[in-house]
A protein has these predicted regions:
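Long, structured stretches of catalytic cores involved in phosphate-ester chemistry, encompassing
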Residues: 1-343
């Protein structure tokens, strides 16, 4: 289903009931069907045809939702758990697990489909359930080409601690500049999914209720600037102390369009809308027929970026891209793309 709050349209997904279970579908490679700790394990061997995550009905819903911007300026996705396994230690600071199939990083192929559909709306993903607060940038084909995901901490985390702790204790490529955290950057999770770790809140001491990394998360949508700020507060923090009271690495502000991190191949003409209106703009790659993204313009103008050479189609409308079509547009360098005046 969906809910719009203050001009932000949230898709609400059920990411449990339609997901395939591992028992009987893949060989058990750990103490229980969804935990893998076999050192010979190959992530590709468990990404089998026919496995599903959201299921076809919810995938269709996400596609339709991404193209319908009625009364919305920004979008977000809510679900129970994360589309990756951004955890190394489960239950204790030395209890390393190679892969956790309980997260939405498995099955991998439908995971990629879900993340790609979220990317089409330049939406962030908000969830919980992982017992460890993290902000990641999802990758599909390449690191960083997908949307941001914020997993909030457990409000009370007495049952099951988790830690982000790479085996080599090194940051990945492209670490976050000036981060107070040592292990940020590009990684693959235990399922082979590409993720960029932006921030994590490891428990300092599971026996100290003030140091076990429980707390709460806040996402602030700035419609004027088209940004989202992720905040992550320890349970016993005093918010009057300002941002310094948050977990190290937070707050984090991301631009709406950064939820699509594909490499830009060129730009279509900048669209200038009559009367300063902000219609919905959809960009389609002609060769594949793929919808690249559907978003609402800001400031009465919008310059579409595309990720391949060749012809593209732009559709425009007030709430959905259903009023005007501009066909046969080819990308150029931004400085040479020009402008088009459009009445929408």
């Amino acid at each position: 289903t969906r809910i719009t709050v203050g001009g932000v349209d949230f898709a609400v997904l059920e990411d449990r009931k339609f997901k395939s279970g591992p028992a009987g579908k893949i060989p058990q490679m750990g103490p229980r069907p969804d935990h893998i700790n076999d050192p010979k394990y190959d992530p590709k061997t468990i990404d089998l045809p026919g496995l599903q995550l959201l299921g076809p009905r919810q995938e269709k819903f996400l596609k339709n939702w991404s193209e319908d911007w009625t009364n919305a300026e920004m979008k977000g996705v809510l679900s129970q758990t994360a589309f990756c396994g951004a955890v190394h230690m489960h239950g204790g600071p030395k209890s390393r697990l190679l892969a956790d199939l309980d997260c939405n990083g498995w099955p991998q192929t439908p995971r990629n489909k879900a993340v790609e559909l979220i990317r089409r709306a330049w939406a962030v993903h908000l969830c919980g359930d992982q017992h460890l607060a993290v902000v990641v940038k999802h990758g599909i084909s390449d690191h960083g080409d997908g949307p941001y995901g914020f997993t909030s901490p457990a409000l009370v985390n007495t049952i099951y601690g988790r830690w982000w702790h790479p085996l080599d204790e090194q940051s990945g490529p492209n670490p976050v500049p000036n981060s107070p955290l040592p292990w940020t950057g590009d990684f693959k999770d235990g399922l082979g999914n590409k993720i960029s770790m932006i921030a994590y809140a490891n428990p300092e001491n599971r026996n100290d209720e003030k140091k076990r990394a429980d707390g709460y998360g806040i996402a602030r949508f700035n419609k004027k600037n088209r940004t989202v700020t992720f905040e992550c507060w320890p349970r016993f923090s005093d918010v009057r102390h300002g941002d310094g009271a948050q977990f190290p690495g937070w707050p984090i502000t991301v631009a709406q369009d950064a939820n699509d991190g594909r490499k830009v191949a060129g730009y279509l003409p900048e669209l200038i809308f009559a009367n300063g209106k902000n219609p919905v703009v959809q960009v389609i790659e002609d060769k594949s027929g793929d919808v690249l993204y559907t978003v609402r313009a800001r400031g009465g103008r919008f310059q579409p970026r595309v990720y391949s050479k060749g012809k593209h189609t732009v559709k425009i409308g007030l709430q959905k891209p259903d009023a005007k079509t501009l066909a046969g547009l080819e990308p150029k360098p931004k400085s040479a793309a020009g402008e088009l005046n459009v009445s929408a």
